[in-house]
Amino acid sequence: MEFHRIYYFLTVAETLNFNRAAERCSVSQPVLRRPIQKLGAEFGGALFRRERGHTHLTELGKTMREFLGRVDASSQEALAAARKALGPESAPLNV
């Protein structure tokens, strides 16, 4: 499971709109869709369904949103802890 797939999935789950999610992620819609489809294949089913021009989470999508939201939050905490552990002396110097 790759983190960009999780990020793309969570962004679409939040917006329920592939166009807006693609804009927010600074990628094209096909670039956004492929990783989400692969993520769904990893879990064994579709994460979203389209109905009359609207995007909805499937039951699998709703369940995975909970779990993957925690994965995303944990990865952000890990990054913050790593930065804190390294301290200010390890920050990159920009000239």
Feature-to-residue mapping (PLM):
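The N-cap/first-turn positions of alpha helices
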Residues: 2-8, 29, 54, 61, ...
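Base-recognition residues in the alpha-helical recognition helix of bacterial helix-turn-helix
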Residues: 7, 34, 49
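Residue cluster at the C-terminal edge of the helix-turn-helix DNA-binding motif
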Residues: 15, 24, 37-46
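Alpha-helical linker/hinge and terminal dimerization helices associated
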Residues: 42-43, 63-86
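Interdomain hinge and pocket-entrance segments immediately C-terminal to HTH DNA-binding domains
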Residues: 53, 83-95
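A short LG(V/I)-centered, amphipathic sequence patch enriched
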Residues: 40-62
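Short helix-boundary/capping micro-motifs
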Residues: 12-31
